[in-house]
Design a protein with these regions (language model features):
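Regulatory alphaC helix of protein kinase catalytic domains
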Residues: 16-25
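A small-residue-enriched
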Residues: 26-94, 115, 206, 233-305, ...
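Short, charged, amphipathic alpha-helical segments
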Residues: 103-106, 169-177, 375-383
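Metallo-beta-lactamase
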Residues: 189, 241, 395
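Bacterial N-terminal signal peptides
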Residues: 1-8
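Boundary at the C-terminal end of the N-terminal hydrophobic targeting segment
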Residues: 8, 13-15
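Amphipathic alpha-helical coiled-coil segments
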Residues: 37-52, 119-144, 153, 160, ...
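Periplasmic alpha-helical coiled-coil/stalk elements that build and connect Gram-negative outer-membrane
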Residues: 116-235, 335-338, 342, 385, ...
Length: 416
Protein backbone atom coordinates (compact mmCIF):
# COMPACT_ATOMS: atom_id res chain seq x y z
CA UNK A 1 0.00 0.00 0.00
CA UNK A 2 2.75 2.46 0.91
CA UNK A 3 4.76 2.15 -2.34
CA UNK A 4 1.57 2.71 -4.32
CA UNK A 5 0.88 5.87 -2.37
CA UNK A 6 4.42 7.11 -2.86
CA UNK A 7 4.10 6.64 -6.61
CA UNK A 8 0.69 8.32 -6.61
CA UNK A 9 2.23 11.27 -4.80
CA UNK A 10 4.78 11.65 -7.56
CA UNK A 11 2.10 11.40 -10.24
CA UNK A 12 -0.05 13.98 -8.48
CA UNK A 13 2.87 16.38 -8.26
CA UNK A 14 3.65 15.93 -11.94
CA UNK A 15 0.03 16.66 -12.84
CA UNK A 16 0.48 19.99 -11.09
CA UNK A 17 3.70 20.59 -13.07
CA UNK A 18 5.72 20.84 -9.88
CA UNK A 19 9.39 21.76 -9.84
CA UNK A 20 11.93 18.95 -9.97
CA UNK A 21 15.07 19.06 -7.86
CA UNK A 22 17.19 20.08 -10.84
CA UNK A 23 14.82 22.97 -11.58
CA UNK A 24 14.79 24.08 -7.94
CA UNK A 25 18.59 23.91 -7.82
CA UNK A 26 19.02 25.88 -11.05
CA UNK A 27 16.56 28.54 -9.90
CA UNK A 28 18.33 28.83 -6.54
CA UNK A 29 21.80 29.20 -8.03
CA UNK A 30 20.54 31.79 -10.51
CA UNK A 31 18.46 33.99 -8.21
CA UNK A 32 19.89 33.66 -4.70
CA UNK A 33 21.26 37.10 -3.69
CA UNK A 34 23.89 35.68 -1.34
CA UNK A 35 25.41 33.57 -4.09
CA UNK A 36 25.22 36.44 -6.57
CA UNK A 37 26.99 38.78 -4.14
CA UNK A 38 29.70 36.21 -3.49
CA UNK A 39 30.17 35.66 -7.23
CA UNK A 40 30.70 39.40 -7.60
CA UNK A 41 33.54 39.09 -5.10
CA UNK A 42 35.14 36.43 -7.31
CA UNK A 43 34.72 38.71 -10.34
CA UNK A 44 36.46 41.50 -8.43
CA UNK A 45 39.38 39.20 -7.68
CA UNK A 46 39.56 38.33 -11.38
CA UNK A 47 39.76 42.03 -12.20
CA UNK A 48 42.62 42.44 -9.72
CA UNK A 49 44.70 40.14 -11.92
CA UNK A 50 44.86 42.97 -14.45
CA UNK A 51 46.22 45.35 -11.83
CA UNK A 52 48.76 42.81 -10.63
CA UNK A 53 50.27 42.40 -14.11
CA UNK A 54 50.56 46.09 -14.95
CA UNK A 55 53.98 47.45 -15.87
CA UNK A 56 55.30 50.53 -14.04
CA UNK A 57 54.45 53.72 -15.91
CA UNK A 58 57.36 55.71 -17.36
CA UNK A 59 57.96 59.09 -15.74
CA UNK A 60 58.27 62.35 -17.68
CA UNK A 61 60.01 65.27 -16.03
CA UNK A 62 60.44 68.75 -17.49
CA UNK A 63 63.08 70.84 -15.72
CA UNK A 64 64.49 74.30 -16.42
CA UNK A 65 67.85 75.76 -15.40
CA UNK A 66 70.38 78.49 -16.30
CA UNK A 67 68.18 81.53 -15.71
CA UNK A 68 70.22 84.53 -14.47
CA UNK A 69 68.61 86.03 -11.40
CA UNK A 70 71.13 88.82 -10.62
CA UNK A 71 73.43 91.13 -12.69
CA UNK A 72 77.10 90.21 -13.02
CA UNK A 73 79.71 92.75 -14.12
CA UNK A 74 76.83 95.07 -14.86
CA UNK A 75 75.45 92.53 -17.32
CA UNK A 76 72.03 91.07 -16.82
CA UNK A 77 70.69 88.74 -19.48
CA UNK A 78 68.33 86.50 -17.48
CA UNK A 79 67.05 84.26 -20.29
CA UNK A 80 70.11 83.98 -22.48
CA UNK A 81 71.51 80.99 -20.60
CA UNK A 82 68.15 79.36 -19.81
CA UNK A 83 67.73 75.80 -21.00
CA UNK A 84 64.92 73.26 -20.63
CA UNK A 85 65.57 69.58 -19.97
CA UNK A 86 62.84 67.01 -20.81
CA UNK A 87 63.58 63.72 -19.03
CA UNK A 88 62.12 60.22 -19.44
CA UNK A 89 62.69 57.63 -16.70
CA UNK A 90 61.52 54.07 -16.25
CA UNK A 91 61.66 51.66 -13.31
CA UNK A 92 62.83 48.25 -14.49
CA UNK A 93 61.43 45.45 -12.31
CA UNK A 94 63.79 42.51 -11.98
CA UNK A 95 63.47 38.92 -10.73
CA UNK A 96 60.04 38.32 -12.33
CA UNK A 97 58.16 40.56 -9.89
CA UNK A 98 55.38 41.26 -12.37
CA UNK A 99 54.89 37.62 -13.30
CA UNK A 100 54.85 36.55 -9.65
CA UNK A 101 52.26 39.22 -8.80
CA UNK A 102 50.04 37.88 -11.57
CA UNK A 103 50.52 34.29 -10.44
CA UNK A 104 49.61 35.20 -6.86
CA UNK A 105 46.51 37.08 -8.03
CA UNK A 106 45.41 34.17 -10.22
CA UNK A 107 45.83 31.76 -7.34
CA UNK A 108 43.79 34.12 -5.18
CA UNK A 109 41.03 34.04 -7.78
CA UNK A 110 41.07 30.25 -7.80
CA UNK A 111 40.83 30.25 -4.01
CA UNK A 112 37.90 32.67 -4.17
CA UNK A 113 36.17 30.50 -6.77
CA UNK A 114 36.64 27.40 -4.61
CA UNK A 115 35.26 29.23 -1.59
CA UNK A 116 32.28 30.33 -3.69
CA UNK A 117 31.66 26.71 -4.64
CA UNK A 118 31.90 25.78 -0.96
CA UNK A 119 29.28 28.39 -0.09
CA UNK A 120 27.08 26.96 -2.82
CA UNK A 121 27.66 23.45 -1.42
CA UNK A 122 26.56 24.41 2.08
CA UNK A 123 23.54 26.40 0.92
CA UNK A 124 22.40 23.60 -1.38
CA UNK A 125 22.25 21.28 1.63
CA UNK A 126 19.72 23.57 3.29
CA UNK A 127 17.80 23.79 0.04
CA UNK A 128 17.80 20.02 -0.44
CA UNK A 129 16.62 19.52 3.15
CA UNK A 130 13.70 21.89 2.54
CA UNK A 131 12.93 20.13 -0.75
CA UNK A 132 12.84 16.73 0.98
CA UNK A 133 10.64 18.15 3.74
CA UNK A 134 8.17 19.35 1.11
CA UNK A 135 8.13 15.96 -0.60
CA UNK A 136 7.62 14.25 2.75
CA UNK A 137 4.79 16.59 3.72
CA UNK A 138 3.08 15.83 0.40
CA UNK A 139 3.39 12.06 0.95
CA UNK A 140 2.07 12.33 4.51
CA UNK A 141 -0.93 14.31 3.24
CA UNK A 142 -1.68 11.71 0.57
CA UNK A 143 -1.40 8.92 3.12
CA UNK A 144 -3.76 10.74 5.49
CA UNK A 145 -6.32 11.16 2.71
CA UNK A 146 -6.03 7.50 1.71
CA UNK A 147 -6.47 6.41 5.33
CA UNK A 148 -9.57 8.58 5.66
CA UNK A 149 -11.05 7.16 2.46
CA UNK A 150 -10.48 3.65 3.76
CA UNK A 151 -11.97 4.51 7.14
CA UNK A 152 -15.04 6.06 5.53
CA UNK A 153 -15.68 2.73 3.84
CA UNK A 154 -15.44 1.05 7.24
CA UNK A 155 -18.01 3.54 8.58
CA UNK A 156 -20.36 2.71 5.69
CA UNK A 157 -19.99 -1.00 6.40
CA UNK A 158 -20.63 -0.38 10.10
CA UNK A 159 -23.83 1.51 9.34
CA UNK A 160 -25.02 -1.33 7.11
CA UNK A 161 -24.32 -3.79 9.91
CA UNK A 162 -26.24 -1.53 12.30
CA UNK A 163 -29.25 -1.54 9.99
CA UNK A 164 -28.97 -5.31 9.72
CA UNK A 165 -28.90 -5.61 13.50
CA UNK A 166 -25.40 -7.05 13.43
CA UNK A 167 -23.75 -4.16 15.30
CA UNK A 168 -24.71 -2.07 18.30
CA UNK A 169 -25.29 1.69 18.04
CA UNK A 170 -22.62 2.39 20.66
CA UNK A 171 -20.00 0.60 18.53
CA UNK A 172 -21.00 2.59 15.46
CA UNK A 173 -20.78 5.81 17.48
CA UNK A 174 -17.29 4.92 18.70
CA UNK A 175 -16.18 4.18 15.15
CA UNK A 176 -17.61 7.44 13.83
CA UNK A 177 -16.08 9.46 16.69
CA UNK A 178 -12.62 8.18 15.80
CA UNK A 179 -13.00 9.75 12.36
CA UNK A 180 -12.02 13.09 13.90
CA UNK A 181 -8.47 11.76 14.36
CA UNK A 182 -8.19 11.24 10.63
CA UNK A 183 -9.53 14.73 9.98
CA UNK A 184 -7.00 16.21 12.41
CA UNK A 185 -4.19 14.32 10.67
CA UNK A 186 -5.26 15.71 7.29
CA UNK A 187 -5.42 19.28 8.56
CA UNK A 188 -2.03 18.94 10.25
CA UNK A 189 -0.59 17.52 7.03
CA UNK A 190 -2.03 20.43 5.03
CA UNK A 191 -0.46 22.95 7.42
CA UNK A 192 2.89 21.13 7.35
CA UNK A 193 2.88 21.01 3.55
CA UNK A 194 2.07 24.70 3.26
CA UNK A 195 4.76 25.58 5.82
CA UNK A 196 7.34 23.49 3.94
CA UNK A 197 6.44 25.23 0.67
CA UNK A 198 6.75 28.67 2.29
CA UNK A 199 10.20 27.82 3.66
CA UNK A 200 11.32 26.52 0.27
CA UNK A 201 10.06 29.65 -1.49
CA UNK A 202 11.91 31.76 1.06
CA UNK A 203 15.16 29.96 0.27
CA UNK A 204 14.49 30.58 -3.42
CA UNK A 205 14.00 34.29 -2.67
CA UNK A 206 10.64 34.02 -4.42
CA UNK A 207 7.98 36.25 -2.89
CA UNK A 208 5.83 36.46 -6.00
CA UNK A 209 4.72 32.87 -6.59
CA UNK A 210 1.54 32.03 -4.62
CA UNK A 211 1.94 29.04 -2.33
CA UNK A 212 -1.11 27.41 -3.91
CA UNK A 213 0.56 27.47 -7.34
CA UNK A 214 3.90 26.13 -6.13
CA UNK A 215 4.65 22.44 -5.83
CA UNK A 216 7.56 20.04 -6.14
CA UNK A 217 7.90 16.57 -7.55
CA UNK A 218 10.53 13.92 -7.13
CA UNK A 219 11.36 10.38 -6.16
CA UNK A 220 10.50 9.71 -2.53
CA UNK A 221 12.15 6.35 -1.97
CA UNK A 222 15.46 4.86 -0.92
CA UNK A 223 18.21 2.84 -2.56
CA UNK A 224 19.09 -0.34 -0.72
CA UNK A 225 22.73 -0.45 -1.84
CA UNK A 226 25.59 1.82 -0.85
CA UNK A 227 29.08 1.98 -2.30
CA UNK A 228 32.09 1.37 -0.02
CA UNK A 229 33.17 4.20 2.26
CA UNK A 230 36.58 4.49 0.60
CA UNK A 231 34.91 5.40 -2.71
CA UNK A 232 33.18 8.37 -1.12
CA UNK A 233 36.38 9.41 0.65
CA UNK A 234 38.30 9.45 -2.61
CA UNK A 235 35.59 11.43 -4.38
CA UNK A 236 35.59 13.95 -1.53
CA UNK A 237 39.36 14.42 -1.76
CA UNK A 238 38.95 15.42 -5.40
CA UNK A 239 35.66 17.31 -5.16
CA UNK A 240 35.43 19.13 -1.82
CA UNK A 241 35.86 22.84 -2.66
CA UNK A 242 36.99 23.82 0.85
CA UNK A 243 39.81 21.27 0.66
CA UNK A 244 40.74 22.50 -2.81
CA UNK A 245 40.80 26.06 -1.47
CA UNK A 246 43.13 24.96 1.34
CA UNK A 247 45.49 23.24 -1.12
CA UNK A 248 45.47 26.26 -3.42
CA UNK A 249 46.28 28.48 -0.44
CA UNK A 250 49.53 26.54 -0.03
CA UNK A 251 50.41 27.29 -3.65
CA UNK A 252 49.62 30.97 -3.19
CA UNK A 253 51.72 31.09 0.00
CA UNK A 254 54.67 29.61 -1.87
CA UNK A 255 54.22 32.13 -4.67
CA UNK A 256 54.00 34.98 -2.16
CA UNK A 257 57.26 33.81 -0.61
CA UNK A 258 58.94 33.88 -4.02
CA UNK A 259 57.51 37.34 -4.55
CA UNK A 260 58.85 38.50 -1.17
CA UNK A 261 62.33 37.31 -2.16
CA UNK A 262 61.95 39.04 -5.52
CA UNK A 263 60.82 42.26 -3.85
CA UNK A 264 64.07 42.21 -1.86
CA UNK A 265 66.08 42.63 -5.04
CA UNK A 266 67.18 45.95 -6.53
CA UNK A 267 65.17 47.60 -9.28
CA UNK A 268 67.14 50.21 -11.24
CA UNK A 269 65.56 53.37 -12.60
CA UNK A 270 66.89 54.26 -16.05
CA UNK A 271 66.65 57.89 -17.14
CA UNK A 272 67.46 59.77 -20.33
CA UNK A 273 67.16 63.45 -21.22
CA UNK A 274 67.74 65.99 -23.95
CA UNK A 275 69.21 69.46 -23.40
CA UNK A 276 69.47 72.45 -25.72
CA UNK A 277 72.00 75.17 -24.88
CA UNK A 278 73.21 73.32 -21.83
CA UNK A 279 75.87 74.66 -19.49
CA UNK A 280 78.74 72.28 -20.00
CA UNK A 281 82.41 72.41 -20.87
CA UNK A 282 81.72 71.96 -24.59
CA UNK A 283 81.10 75.43 -26.11
CA UNK A 284 79.66 73.77 -29.21
CA UNK A 285 77.33 71.45 -27.30
CA UNK A 286 74.00 73.09 -28.01
CA UNK A 287 72.13 69.79 -28.49
CA UNK A 288 73.08 67.21 -25.89
CA UNK A 289 71.80 63.94 -24.51
CA UNK A 290 72.20 62.59 -21.00
CA UNK A 291 71.48 59.32 -19.23
CA UNK A 292 71.56 57.94 -15.72
CA UNK A 293 70.92 54.73 -13.83
CA UNK A 294 69.55 54.98 -10.29
CA UNK A 295 70.29 51.82 -8.27
CA UNK A 296 68.97 51.64 -4.68
CA UNK A 297 71.50 50.18 -2.28
CA UNK A 298 69.64 47.44 -0.37
CA UNK A 299 71.86 47.65 2.67
CA UNK A 300 69.26 47.80 5.44
CA UNK A 301 65.91 46.96 3.85
CA UNK A 302 66.04 43.69 1.94
CA UNK A 303 62.40 42.82 2.70
CA UNK A 304 63.52 40.51 5.50
CA UNK A 305 60.27 40.69 7.48
CA UNK A 306 58.04 39.83 4.54
CA UNK A 307 60.28 36.93 3.59
CA UNK A 308 59.97 35.49 7.09
CA UNK A 309 56.23 36.13 7.25
CA UNK A 310 55.53 34.36 3.96
CA UNK A 311 57.72 31.43 5.02
CA UNK A 312 55.63 31.07 8.18
CA UNK A 313 52.47 31.42 6.10
CA UNK A 314 53.50 28.40 4.02
CA UNK A 315 53.70 26.25 7.16
CA UNK A 316 50.39 27.63 8.42
CA UNK A 317 48.69 26.86 5.10
CA UNK A 318 50.04 23.31 5.14
CA UNK A 319 48.69 22.75 8.64
CA UNK A 320 45.32 24.23 7.65
CA UNK A 321 45.12 21.88 4.66
CA UNK A 322 45.76 18.88 6.92
CA UNK A 323 42.98 20.07 9.22
CA UNK A 324 40.68 20.49 6.20
CA UNK A 325 41.52 16.97 5.03
CA UNK A 326 40.70 15.54 8.46
CA UNK A 327 37.41 17.47 8.48
CA UNK A 328 36.52 16.03 5.07
CA UNK A 329 37.05 12.47 6.30
CA UNK A 330 35.05 13.19 9.45
CA UNK A 331 32.14 14.66 7.48
CA UNK A 332 32.09 11.77 5.00
CA UNK A 333 32.31 9.10 7.70
CA UNK A 334 29.52 10.68 9.76
CA UNK A 335 27.18 11.12 6.81
CA UNK A 336 27.96 7.64 5.50
CA UNK A 337 27.08 6.13 8.88
CA UNK A 338 23.73 7.96 8.91
CA UNK A 339 22.83 6.79 5.41
CA UNK A 340 23.86 3.22 6.16
CA UNK A 341 21.85 3.24 9.40
CA UNK A 342 18.73 4.53 7.65
CA UNK A 343 19.05 1.86 4.96
CA UNK A 344 19.32 -0.80 7.66
CA UNK A 345 16.11 0.51 9.25
CA UNK A 346 14.23 0.83 5.97
CA UNK A 347 14.96 -2.60 4.52
CA UNK A 348 12.81 -4.59 6.99
CA UNK A 349 9.95 -2.15 6.42
CA UNK A 350 10.10 -2.68 2.67
CA UNK A 351 10.69 -6.42 2.88
CA UNK A 352 8.37 -7.27 5.76
CA UNK A 353 6.73 -4.68 8.00
CA UNK A 354 4.69 -2.81 5.38
CA UNK A 355 3.09 -5.95 3.97
CA UNK A 356 2.72 -7.39 7.45
CA UNK A 357 0.91 -4.32 8.77
CA UNK A 358 -1.41 -4.29 5.75
CA UNK A 359 -2.13 -8.00 6.14
CA UNK A 360 -2.87 -7.64 9.87
CA UNK A 361 -5.18 -4.70 9.26
CA UNK A 362 -7.15 -6.46 6.51
CA UNK A 363 -7.31 -9.74 8.45
CA UNK A 364 -8.51 -8.14 11.68
CA UNK A 365 -10.97 -5.98 9.73
CA UNK A 366 -12.41 -9.07 8.04
CA UNK A 367 -12.58 -10.92 11.36
CA UNK A 368 -14.29 -7.96 13.04
CA UNK A 369 -16.85 -7.69 10.24
CA UNK A 370 -17.71 -11.35 10.74
CA UNK A 371 -17.72 -11.31 14.52
CA UNK A 372 -14.34 -12.96 14.97
CA UNK A 373 -12.58 -9.97 16.56
CA UNK A 374 -13.51 -7.29 19.05
CA UNK A 375 -13.94 -3.63 18.24
CA UNK A 376 -10.80 -2.85 20.25
CA UNK A 377 -8.78 -5.31 18.18
CA UNK A 378 -10.10 -3.69 15.02
CA UNK A 379 -9.24 -0.15 16.16
CA UNK A 380 -5.78 -1.22 17.34
CA UNK A 381 -5.08 -2.83 13.97
CA UNK A 382 -6.07 0.40 12.22
CA UNK A 383 -3.80 2.43 14.50
CA UNK A 384 -0.86 0.05 14.10
CA UNK A 385 -1.13 0.19 10.32
CA UNK A 386 -1.12 3.98 10.29
CA UNK A 387 1.87 4.10 12.65
CA UNK A 388 3.85 1.72 10.43
CA UNK A 389 2.96 3.80 7.37
CA UNK A 390 4.01 7.05 9.02
CA UNK A 391 7.21 5.55 10.43
CA UNK A 392 8.16 4.31 6.97
CA UNK A 393 7.60 7.73 5.42
CA UNK A 394 9.59 9.43 8.19
CA UNK A 395 12.45 6.99 7.72
CA UNK A 396 12.54 7.68 3.99
CA UNK A 397 12.62 11.40 4.76
CA UNK A 398 15.50 10.81 7.18
CA UNK A 399 17.29 8.74 4.53
CA UNK A 400 16.94 11.44 1.88
CA UNK A 401 18.14 14.09 4.33
CA UNK A 402 21.16 11.99 5.31
CA UNK A 403 21.82 11.35 1.60
CA UNK A 404 21.85 15.12 1.09
CA UNK A 405 24.29 15.39 3.98
CA UNK A 406 26.51 12.77 2.33
CA UNK A 407 26.36 14.69 -0.95
CA UNK A 408 27.43 17.83 0.90
CA UNK A 409 30.23 15.94 2.68
CA UNK A 410 31.52 14.50 -0.59
CA UNK A 411 31.18 17.75 -2.51
CA UNK A 412 28.97 16.50 -5.33
CA UNK A 413 25.72 14.57 -5.80
CA UNK A 414 26.60 10.91 -5.36
CA UNK A 415 23.10 9.86 -4.23
CA UNK A 416 20.09 11.25 -6.07
Amino acid sequence: MVPVLLYACGSHAEAQTGYTWDQIKAKFETDNPTLKADQSNVDEMKAEEITAYLRPNPQFTLSQDGTQIAPHNNVWQPLRGTYVVPTISYLHEREHKRELRLESAQEGTRIGQAQHQDLDRNMLFGLRTAFVATLQARVVLDLAKADLDYYDKIIDISRNRLRAGDLAQIDVDRIELLRVQYEVEIQSAIVNLRTAKIQLLQLLDDNKTPVEQFDVTGRFDFTGTLRPLDDFRQIALNARPDLQAALQTIQQSETNHKLAISNGSTDPTISGWYTYNSSNNNPNGLDTLGASVNIPLRIFDRNQGEKQRTQIDIARSQQASEAARAQVFSDVDTAYTLVDSNIALLKPYKDKYNDQALRVRDTVTYAWQHGGASLMDFLNAQSDYRQVQLAYVQLIGAYLTSAAQLNMAVGQEVIQ
